[in-house]
């Protein structure tokens, strides 16, 4: 619902992640179909690409993320680790420390495993995009949601209109973590949380 604090919540999540992580540790893909909410982050070093405002480019960005997820999962498999935190702890960090302790030159770093920063894909106002590319968008979101966490790729989706046309059953089944701010009706609350309650919130985030 308008005025519920969604934009404030999104900015707080982004700022908290920026404060805690360097560009080497975390990268963002920000999608802002409304043009005014996330474009203020253009130019920060954490962005993998300028803030995406063109709906056509959103599908391309998500397809890139799927390929990157699959590439990373192959790297994890080759190094016999289960997720990206284990990769950093057992593979990348020890190799980097050994390289630095040896006083090697940067051009000799070819033997050091590739650093894999976390990637956060944040889509503001999913409803606008779902009205244009419902099937393609749902397919990309579900593929990422199913396997991307181990690869260090995370999705944050937001919408003012939590209808079943936007938060489809398939998307909902694959995104277990949800936050509901104030909504207009009990039906909207049930769409997000599977229970009533969000319609009784004060509307201040």
Predicted regions: what they are:
Residues 1, 12, 201-203:
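Primarily NTPase-proximal linker/entry elements flanking Walker-type ATP/GTP-binding cores
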Residues 3, 43-53, 125-131:
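A broad detector of the eukaryotic-type serine/threonine protein kinase catalytic domain
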Residues 6:
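Conserved lysine of the Walker
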């Amino acid at each position: 619902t308008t005025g519920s604090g969604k934009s404030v919540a999104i900015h707080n999540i982004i700022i908290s992640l920026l404060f805690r992580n360097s560009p080497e540790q975390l990268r963002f893909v920000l999608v802002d179909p409304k043009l005014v909410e996330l474009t203020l982050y253009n130019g920060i070093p954490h962005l993998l690409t300028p803030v995406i405002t063109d709906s056509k480019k959103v599908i391309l960005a998500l397809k890139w993320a799927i390929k990157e997820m699959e590439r990373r999962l192959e790297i994890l498999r080759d190094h016999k680790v289960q997720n990206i935190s284990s990769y950093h702890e057992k593979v990348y960090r020890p190799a980097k420390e050994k390289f630095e302790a040896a006083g090697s030159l940067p051009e000799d770093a070819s033997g050091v495993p590739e650093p894999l920063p976390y990637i956060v894909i944040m889509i503001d106002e999913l409803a606008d995009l779902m009205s244009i590319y419902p099937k393609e968008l749902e397919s990309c979101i579900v593929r990422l949601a199913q396997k991307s966490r181990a690869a260090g790729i995370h999705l944050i989706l937001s919408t003012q209109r939590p209808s079943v046309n936007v938060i489809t059953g398939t998307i909902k089944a694959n995104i277990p973590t949800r936050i509901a701010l104030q909504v207009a009706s009990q039906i909207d609350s049930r769409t997000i949380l599977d229970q009533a309650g969000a319609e009784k919130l004060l509307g201040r985030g």
